[in-house]
Amino acid sequence: MYAVIKTGGKQYKVAAGEKLKIEQIPAEIGSEITLDQVLAVGESASLKLGDPLVNGAAVMATVVSQGRHDKVTIFKMRRRKHYQKHQGHRQNFTEILINTIKA
């Protein structure tokens, strides 16, 4: 069984037992969270689509860790004008383990 969930402005296809890095959620490590924005639920040949969400569907997950992604370097330059600008960014993430999918 799999589900398509929406969290942090992004959509993820998840199945039970998967580990997933999502946008940061303020939750303690080891705590159980419920992701209730489920867009679709599928099982082998059948697919249940929401309009926009599937009624009564939820995904239960456990927070495994909190962290930061690798640094992304931004470099801006204007040719012949002696303008150069360096900037870096590190995005926070939450790693979760999908426990169950309730449809």
UniProtKB/Swiss-Prot annotation:
A GO term for molecular function: rRNA binding
Gene Ontology CC annotation, any one: ribosome
Gene Ontology BP terms: translation
Pfam families documented for this protein: Ribosomal_L21p (PF00829)
Ranges that cross the membrane: none
Family matches, as InterPro entries: bL21-like (IPR028909), bL21-like_sf (IPR036164), Ribosomal_bL21 (IPR001787), Ribosomal_bL21_CS (IPR018258)
Alphabetical keyword list: Ribonucleoprotein, Ribosomal protein, RNA-binding, rRNA-binding
Quaternary state and interactors: Part of the 50S ribosomal subunit. Contacts protein L20.
Role summary: This protein binds to 23S rRNA in the presence of protein L20.
Similarity remark: Belongs to the bacterial ribosomal protein bL21 family.
HAMAP family (alphabetical): Ribosomal_bL21
Full protein name: Large ribosomal subunit protein bL21
Source taxonomy: Bacteria, Pseudomonadati, Pseudomonadota, Betaproteobacteria, Burkholderiales
